[in-house]
């Protein structure tokens, strides 16, 4: 019997391993008695931690399913499980009444659930690598993958599925799902902080702030769950339609007050963007007006930047037709028109306090379509509102204007039919009021003054350019061309060269009339919506609305110049 004892000691020494704490930290386990597995090591004694040693099996080959089940049940130690269960309780004991959802996101086990989950957990897993653990009672746990990022790792680096607590359902969340993880457990039921992290769909050719007011219909109405925005496919891919509506309130339902607040913030951002664009545009317009009024623009210098050293620095970096005075004039007019269209899309910006919009989204779409169709088909005399503060400019006559007038009449008839059908649809759709809250935000005085400065500068620029063209046409025969460097134009694939002087001037007058008509249409619309406020009084100083036949000084002068130019052209002289 005495000879068998050394063999037993040798067998135990071969099977002995480091304690659980040293093995988890990958440190050398130092024991006072080398052949004793019950004596605590020096590191555990210094840390005042109970030293637990669990024998590890020889991992020569993977165990079968039946062998693995028997092996797991035979190695279950209730005392070790109780000791390991005390560690997470001590870790979270100082957290107080922390939100349970934060414990879910960080992976820490909820101490309120340890009473039943710690007894089921095996802190030291002895399964072979590459095999998932089988749960004896799967009803207490969620069927998540074994390598979930929220799982707590064992001492050997393998995840413990028992430590994964309840995870929030992200399938019905919007955006990145931050608010869905905290809102159900929030004491106040609010997720205002996470509302600012929702993604926004940006388009390259349009401002991102405009998407909430243009073509995107509202995803939900009041009382509709946010989960209806989710659409699944048979292939397992999740398709989310991008939406810029306000974030949902408590339990995923829409809150009208929050939606109104976010829309007001977006409107203020749009106005700030328009102010910045108008400031940049007015600086360029004032430089162009100063150059034209200085008398230095003569002959070809109207269309070329040669011999204009002071103007070269301003024009440095520009390409194409914008290097010419006429090119810059048309470009500035188009920029002013784009800014006015941007404000027109956001109709709530132009409402003074006390005004409410009674139409639904269908009526808004019909109105927008009618406006765009009418704008694209209107030229010259068919403009509904007066250009330059009065009646439309005189229509073109002659061979060129005959076809233009015919096409304009066709466009006018089609516009009339479209407006008739649109009016019937509009009357049927305006019967029900909109459920979205009306936003009253008046157009401020700063933006109105910027619009007036830009509009008067554009009129002065057109007046200076057309005055030079009028004087040159009257002083030169109809066959000669005083515009040798006029940029070539493309009209339906036909290139208009420098030899066709009259045709170039006709096209320039027609394009200018069309742009100015649209600019003044939108200024009149802004003035109508600002009735009784300071912006309306400021616009009345430029837009003469008392008598349409009486234009302002600038408008009357520009119309007279255009008539003189047309009288001297060859097609109109005949």
Swiss-Prot record:
Residues 19-51 bind DNA. Gene3D superfamilies: Zn(2)-C6 fungal-type DNA-binding domain. SUPFAM superfamilies: Zn2/Cys6 DNA-binding domain (SSF57701). One of its GO terms (molecular function) is DNA-binding transcription factor activity, RNA polymerase II-specific. It holds the Pfam family Zn_clus. Residues 111-133, 242-262, 376-404 are annotated as: Disordered. Keywords: DNA-binding, Metal-binding, Nucleus, Transcription, Transcription regulation, Zinc. One of its GO terms (cellular component) is nucleus. InterPro entries: Zn2-C6_fun-type_DNA-bd_sf (IPR036864), Zn2Cys6_DnaBD (IPR001138). PROSITE patterns: ZN2_CY6_FUNGAL_1, ZN2_CY6_FUNGAL_2. Signal peptide: none annotated. It is found in: Nucleus. Disulfide bonds: none annotated. Transcription factor that positively regulates the expression of the gene cluster that mediates the biosynthesis of oxaleimides, cytotoxic compounds containing an unusual disubstituted succinimide moiety. This is C6 finger transcription factor poxB. It comes from Penicillium oxalicum (strain 114-2 / CGMCC 5302) (Penicillium decumbens).
């Amino acid at each position: 019997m005495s000879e068998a004892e050394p063999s037993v000691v040798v067998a135990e020494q071969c099977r002995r391993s480091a304690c659980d704490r040293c093995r988890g930290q990958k440190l050398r386990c130092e024991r006072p008695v080398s052949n004793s597995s019950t004596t605590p090591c020096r590191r555990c004694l210094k840390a005042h931690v109970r030293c637990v040693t669990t024998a590890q099996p020889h991992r020569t080959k993977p165990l079968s399913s039946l062998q693995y089940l028997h092996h797991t049940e035979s190695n279950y130690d209730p005392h070790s499980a109780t000791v390991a269960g005390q560690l997470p309780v001590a870790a979270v004991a100082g957290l107080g009444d922390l939100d349970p959802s934060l414990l879910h996101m960080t992976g820490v086990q909820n101490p309120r659930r340890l009473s039943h989950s710690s007894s089921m957990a095996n802190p030291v897993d002895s399964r072979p690598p590459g095999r998932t653990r089988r749960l004896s009672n799967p009803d207490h746990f969620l069927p998540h993958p074994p390598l979930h990022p929220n799982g707590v790792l064992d001492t050997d680096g393998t995840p413990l599925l028992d430590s994964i607590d309840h995870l929030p359902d992200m399938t019905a969340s919007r955006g990145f799902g931050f608010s869905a993880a905290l809102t159900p457990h929030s004491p106040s039921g609010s997720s205002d902080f996470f509302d600012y992290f929702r993604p926004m769909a940006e388009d390259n050719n349009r401002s991102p702030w405009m998407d909430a007011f243009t073509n995107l219909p509202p995803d939900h109405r009041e009382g509709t769950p946010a989960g209806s925005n989710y659409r699944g496919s048979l292939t397992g891919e999740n398709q989310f339609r991008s939406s810029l509506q306000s974030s949902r309130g408590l339990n995923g339902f829409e809150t009208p007050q929050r939606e109104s607040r976010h829309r007001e913030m977006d409107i203020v951002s749009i106005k700030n963007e328009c102010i910045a664009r108008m400031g940049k545009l007015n600086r360029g317009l004032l430089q162009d007006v100063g150059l034209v009024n200085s008398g230095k623009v003569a002959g070809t210098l109207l269309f070329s930047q040669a011999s204009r050293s002071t103007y070269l620095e301003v024009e440095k970096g520009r390409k194409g037709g914008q290097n010419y005075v006429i090119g810059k004039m048309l470009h500035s007019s188009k920029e002013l028109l784009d800014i006015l269209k941007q404000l027109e899309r956001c109709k709530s910006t132009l409402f003074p306090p006390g005004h409410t919009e009674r139409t639904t989204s269908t009526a808004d779409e019909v109105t927008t379509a009618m406006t765009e169709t009418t704008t694209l088909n209107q030229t010259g005399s068919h403009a509904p509102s007066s250009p330059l503060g009065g009646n439309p400019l005189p229509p073109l006559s002659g061979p060129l204007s005959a076809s233009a007038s015919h096409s304009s009449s066709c466009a006018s008839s089609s516009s009339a039919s479209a407006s008739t059908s649109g009016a019937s649809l509009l009357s049927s759709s305006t019967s029900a009021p909109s459920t979205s809250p009306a936003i009253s935000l008046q157009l401020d005085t700063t933006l109105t003054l910027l619009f007036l400065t830009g509009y008067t500068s554009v009129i002065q620029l057109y007046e200076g350019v057309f005055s030079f063209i009028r004087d040159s046409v009257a002083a030169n025969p109809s066959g000669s061309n005083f515009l040798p460097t006029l940029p070539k134009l493309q009209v339906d694939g036909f290139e208009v060269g420098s030899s066709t002087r009259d045709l170039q001037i006709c096209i320039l007058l027609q394009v200018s009339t069309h742009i100015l008509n649209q600019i003044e249409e939108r200024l009149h619309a802004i003035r109508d919506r600002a009735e009784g406020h300071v912006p309306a009084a400021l616009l009345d100083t430029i837009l003469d609305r008392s008598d349409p036949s009486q234009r302002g000084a600038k408008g009357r002068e520009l119309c007279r110049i255009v008539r003189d130019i047309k009288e001297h052209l060859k097609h109109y002289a005949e």
